[in-house]
Amino acid sequence: MAKWLDNAIFYEIYPQSFLDTNGDGIGDFQGIIERLDYIKKLGCNAIWMNPCFASPFGDAGYDVADYYQAAPRYGTNADLKRLFHEVHKRDMHILLDLVPGHTSVAHPWFKESCKADRNEFTDRYIWTQDWQQDPDDPGPKATLAEMENVMRFWIGMGCDGFRVDMAGSLVKNDEDGKGNIALWRKVRTFLDAEFPEAVLVSEWGEPDKSLQGGFHMDFLLHFGPSHYNDLFRCEEPFFSGRGKGDVAAFVEKYKENYEKAQRKGLICIPSGNHDMDRLARSIHGEELKVAFAFLLSMPGAPFLYYGDGIGMRYVEKLHSVEGGYGRTGSRSPMQWDHTTNAGFSAAPKEKLYVKQDESADRPTVEAQMADPDSLYHEIQKLINIRQAHSALQSRGEIEFVYAEEKQYPLAYLRSDDKEKILVIINPADREVSFDGNYAVREALYTFGGEAVFTGGKVTVPGGSAGFYLL
């Protein structure tokens, strides 16, 4: 496994919404290049960029029309290669978003596959509901070989690997996952032979399967059995200050996945992504700081969705754009400063491909960087602490010491062969306590007040988070 994943912290870029440098109302590769220093200063050292290939953009670029060509609205292949170079100049890494399970109807493969006369593309797509080919039949094998060619092309140009869209769905009617696992094992064998440092991250949501398939990491997501939504995106999120949430089911499922994942790969807990409501739609203000203390102290590589680091909001009541439907409000343009269109674009407001948050109090990078008490600075502080302590990084062990049903706080130990750190997270706006004897050497980080350790009991202030070196 690539060594750089040990301390990787990812920043997800939705390219059309990040920064527009040519005034067409759509973000571009040059815009990403111009903001790499911001990403690095925040503390992130890796990037996942959403699809950037040629597309009619009926589904935000997930409808690929040419896997070998950058979307002209973002730039050229040469521009993308330059982006890879600029990322690497800063000792960072970048993953592209690979969409292997479907294409746009505009893709030449699909147009050929539609023809009545059989040809080399006839079996590249599934055309019937009543039967399907075996993954080892010539048609599916040719498709897999072509996906390997796509990977070979972009890794050769300089990308460091791929986040794979809907990775667990390529083999249909595969209830136990064995068909998909076998398919991805073949891809892993190919990569290990030609590009052993290339990283694969899956959108699967079942680490017990994806990591068997050779992925380095899998996300816990808003779908699937992880109880991820219990944390931030349900009627009573655990990270709401109301303190009516429940983290127990999430922890039980996490422990189950963690045991299965040991020595095979990593489990990632993202702040959000382009398919979810913004984090700030359900939790707010200081609650966000406590949430990031959790996200940045768990095993696996953290993923920060663009804008989450300044508390960007879900923009309500937007018309669907590029197939976003209810997700469109989470894809609004990045808010950089106080200038026109919050610094995203010099285009007239009505020319932006999707509307922005037009609130007078919308958060911006400029304002948050100027405010020492901002969410931006809290995240920066948390990342610095994580990078200074290997026990808090991707491969440090975790042991949950308090995660009771409908109770607060959440407490867990992070450890490696160098140190042991107790993490206590209390989003509830009330003081709580739990039993435990801990000899604390140093409070590495506190927000909202410091826990008190006396008489075999730990008393935790409301709305607080703390990392304690034992």
State what each model feature region is:
Residues V105, K111-S113, D117-P140, R188-P333, ...:
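Conserved alpha/beta catalytic core and glycan-binding cleft of carbohydrate-active enzymes
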Residues L5-N7, G214, E252-K253, P270, ...:
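Loop/helix patches that line or flank the sugar-binding groove of alpha-linked glycan CAZymes
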Residues R35, D79, L83, T143-W154, ...:
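Alpha-helical packing segments of well-folded alpha/beta enzyme cores
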Residues Q16-F18, A54-S55, P100-G101, D160, ...:
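Short, solvent-exposed loop/turn segments at secondary-structure junctions
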Residues E431-G449:
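Beta-strand-rich binding/interaction modules
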Residues T454-L470:
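C-terminal beta-strand-rich structural cap/linker in extracellular carbohydrate-active enzymes
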Residues A46, D91-H93, M151, D160-R163, ...:
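Beta-sheet entry/capping signal
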